[in-house]
């Protein structure tokens, strides 16, 4: 009897082990939900959008004090609209996403999220984000956010199955967040009052952002050209497997960024801003030249990573070297 009791105690796992075993599925489930949410909203893209909106608001405000409550509200609303557009994009592309290894695990492509639930998130995010940008900023900024959504979801996404020109259209959608920030910071009113300097700087920054996207996305298109081909997406590296046209567009865009850097620096008279932006653009040109000559995965990967550094430098210089701001006093 004593032996049986002893064996029973030996065979029975401690209560803490049972508790740990019961907790593991819940932890794994939470991680899975967080991973799915991250894939749906694509936080890195959303962060890039928010940085551009903030930079535009900062440049537009000039020497005026920013309303930081408005800034936070506009950024939050923009992030929600961006998340909505990302989910809508994945709904429309769920069939092609299943054909590519890099996107096959997305929640909609893998069937972990229903279309109905996804559309509810899209509608709620669009309405909520639009309203937030309107309340925190103004109606014009909210309409710019709506136009960005329409261009990305309604034009760029279907064009990927039709023509390589999709990149040029997608770059417009990628640069439009600059307009959200400019409108939210009362850029049109300043323009009507005769102050064109801030608007010129913002326009130059928007142009830089538009041009920046060509080398960036051509590098991605080259690295995943086989997957895009399997999904029958009309990327330039699919329709022209040699990569010459993709390399040419990358190099032309990078070259055009150098004079635009000067236009961005003129309003503030900041030599440091011009030199920083021009130097970053020159490096971008050199890396694009390397890709044009080699047209291999290594040169494309170097171009891709360089593009991220160039974007960071451009946005940082736009904020750091622009007109000084008054950061004290009332923010309301």
Predicted regions located by residue number:
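Topogenic membrane-insertion module of multi-pass membrane proteins
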Residues: 1-95, 118
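Membrane-embedded alpha-helical segments that form the functional core of polytopic membrane enzymes
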Residues: 51-59, 63-94, 102, 126, ...
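Cytosolic, membrane-interface loops and tails of multi-pass inner-membrane proteins
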Residues: 17-32, 92-113, 218-245
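Intramembrane alpha-helical segments
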Residues: 115-187
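Juxtamembrane boundary at the C-terminal end of a transmembrane helix
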Residues: 316-332
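Multi-pass membrane catalytic core of lipid/isoprenoid biosynthesis enzymes
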Residues: 94, 102-142, 241-266
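Interfacial loop-to-transmembrane junctions
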Residues: 285-313
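Small-residue-rich segments of transmembrane alpha-helices in multi-pass membrane proteins
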Residues: 51-54, 107, 169-185, 245, ...
